[in-house]
Amino acid sequence: MDASTLFKKVKVKRVLGSLEQQIDDITTDSRTAREGSIFVASVGYTVDSHKFCQSVADQGCKLVVVNKEQSLPANVTQVVVPDTLRVASILAHTLFDYPSHQLVTFGVTGTNGKTSIATMIHLIQRKLQKNSAYLGTNGFQINETKTKGANTTPETVSLTKKIKEAVDAGAESMTLEVSSHGLVLGRLRGVEFDVAIFSNLTQDHLDFHGTMEAYGHAKSLLFSQLGEDLSKEKYVVLNNDDSFSEYLRTVTPYEVFSYGIDEEAQFMAENIQESLQGVSFDFVTPFGTYPVKSPYVGKFNISNIMAAMIAVWSKGTSLETIIKAVENLEPVEGRLEVLDPSLPIDLIIDYAHTADGMNKLIDAVQPFVKQKLIFLVGMAGERDLTKTPEMGRVACRADYVIFTPDNPANDDPKMLTAELAKGATHQNYIEFDDRAEGIKHAIDIAEPGDTVVLASKGREPYQIMPGHIKVPHRDDLIGLEAAYKKFGGGPVGQ
């Protein structure tokens, strides 16, 4: 596309050089800038990428978007604008022909449950033989092909490219986990959502948002982003068991479908039966009551299942067809995931990293604990510490508790575990400043019949250490290695 055409939608401040050049890519990553691409510089929290403008010029890039004039060779065109990342959204969506308009786009937001609901929607679509894409905490996936990602919601240009990649691969729908950070930072500008889903709102990320009011407002931006064009068929799916849903009803003109277990809703679950092999319930809908069986464990996952089913149903698939698909869904990685059922202990990993998420996790597993419940939880560094003692209190619902850091970054690991211990309600706990050692200890003290829960990370494949260096780490692999060493078994008979 000719750059002059591309920039017609942008009210630029100043252009230094010529826009008569062909553009086939846009990037905010200086390492990928080249001839034919636009490099968009920005001022981030830790890095001002304007300092890389000379580097991208050396790589052959002839067009940069900046917030102030840079000292660059005359053959490099500079487009000066007040808000470079806002302009990046406009340019990316225009250059790649508005990819989110070319498929059905589901957006899932909430403190807990985003990954589960988004993954369930993707898996249901696959069971229905539909080409589907997923983007979120567990990476980027088109049908069964997976790649890892760095953020739940990538920056705006990367996100647009992922949607374009899904479209080019023939995806009929794409499900996005929508983080509050991504909404506030404008990473989702220009994405055309068709269905917006809300799971819940509990305390988290106050280190970024400051107050619960600001955090709630951030979540509401997804529903505002649906727009006001009632000629389009768009829908909202809200959890009536969370009172914040009432506010979200007020920020969108589109039809709302509510679900709930404890509070009255259009879609409800009754006659719930739970086990470590899954759940069953009666799905009470405006069109009748349907028996549902699911391989997902825990009452909270019933809420997630309902949200996913309603979202897919809203776009035209019958409930009967969806319910049949739900019975045979694969596990959501790292979400109440039981590792190797052949072990004499129940070894479970989960992503729960808030007091509310941990409460629901313990509620789900406690009825099936045969002997002791051993619970390991971590606190992340450089995060809101006001939630930490409450996490420690909830963890002490277990018989034995292990406090560890989780992505300590530049914080003192001992300080993080001490903050968790402030909430302890019994003395049956221990602190480890090395999470891997804490996991090994959990297995070491476990006896046949015990349940060991490793919370806070799921299958996250790293620990963020001082200097924000990512060090390889997998709770599941460390736990399984220790369990096979103690109890025997394993894929190679350790």
From Swiss-Prot:
Compartment(s) where it occurs, according to its Swiss-Prot or TrEMBL record: Cytoplasm
GO BP, one annotated term: cell wall organization
Enzyme Commission code(s) on record: 6.3.2.7
Positions of UDP-N-acetyl-alpha-D-muramoyl-L-alanyl-D-glutamate binding: 30, 152-153, 179, 187
Disulfide bonds: none
Record-level Gene Ontology MF annotations: ATP binding; magnesium ion binding; UDP-N-acetylmuramoyl-L-alanyl-D-glutamate-L-lysine ligase activity
Span of the annotated motif L-lysine recognition motif: 406-409
PTM sites of type N6-carboxylysine: 219
Gene3D superfamilies: Mur ligase, C-terminal domain, Mur-like, catalytic domain, MurE/MurF, N-terminal domain
Family that this chain belongs to: Belongs to the MurCDEF family. MurE subfamily.
Function of the protein: Catalyzes the addition of L-lysine to the nucleotide precursor UDP-N-acetylmuramoyl-L-alanyl-D-glutamate (UMAG) in the biosynthesis of bacterial cell-wall peptidoglycan.
Protein name, UniProt field: UDP-N-acetylmuramoyl-L-alanyl-D-glutamate--L-lysine ligase
Source species of the chain: Staphylococcus aureus (strain bovine RF122 / ET3-1)
Name of the coding gene: murE
